[in-house]
Regions:
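Non-catalytic interaction-recognition regions
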Residues: 1-183
Length: 183
């Protein structure tokens, strides 16, 4: 990150198409490597599915990196960081989403593409573990975050929130094995 314009070794400017192609290649490579782990949501998928997921990861990594920056900060380009599955990155959030979908699928819960938010009846909610409470409180902040993003027109605030959700879910996933529960 030397803050100079992004150029190829030959001195040419880097095109968005070439940047996305490299991000897709790295995303696919990482997805394929992770699919070897039996615990991975991508384990057992065929080549076509792995390619599609790798493509989505690569493109979303670049988009997330762009949207996550506050407008007042310098733009520092680091493709390795962008496609990483750790830290404040799009792939980290996508991986959390894949984990959530995998849990729901294993539990036999079908989630429609679009979810309506009906008014829920008030009921006591017992959250016995700190990780459960933290995740619930983080999720409850969503309407306020969306209103704040709409008011300020700063998508970086939504990215920060999604990162917090993914991190809270990661702790919850590690500390509260819901599918192993007898309840």
């Amino acid at each position: 990150p030397d803050k100079r314009p992004l150029k190829t070794r030959s001195g040419e400017n880097v095109t968005l198409a070439s940047l996305l192609a490299e991000a897709v290649a790295r995303g696919e490579s990482e997805v394929r490597a992770r699919s070897a782990d039996p615990e991975s949501p991508t384990h057992g998928l065929d080549d076509t599915e792995l390619h599609a997921i790798g493509r989505a990861v690569g493109i979303a990594a670049v988009k997330y990196a762009d949207l996550s920056l506050e407008v007042s900060r310098d733009y520092v380009f680091d493709l390795d960081r962008m496609v990483s599955f750790q830290g404040d990155t799009g792939p980290y959030i996508q991986y959390a989403h894949a984990r959530i979908r995998s849990i729901l699928e294993k539990a036999g819960v079908e989630v429609p593409f679009e979810i309506e938010s009906p008014a829920l009846p008030e009921a006591p909610l017992a959250l016995g573990e700190p990780a459960e409470r933290d995740l619930a409180l983080t999720l409850l902040a969503y309407p306020g975050v969306v209103a704040d993003v709409a008011r300020t027109l700063e998508p970086s605030r939504l990215c920060t929130y999604l990162q917090r959700v993914a991190a809270a879910f990661s702790v919850f996933y590690r500390e509260c094995p819901v599918l192993k529960s007898e309840e």
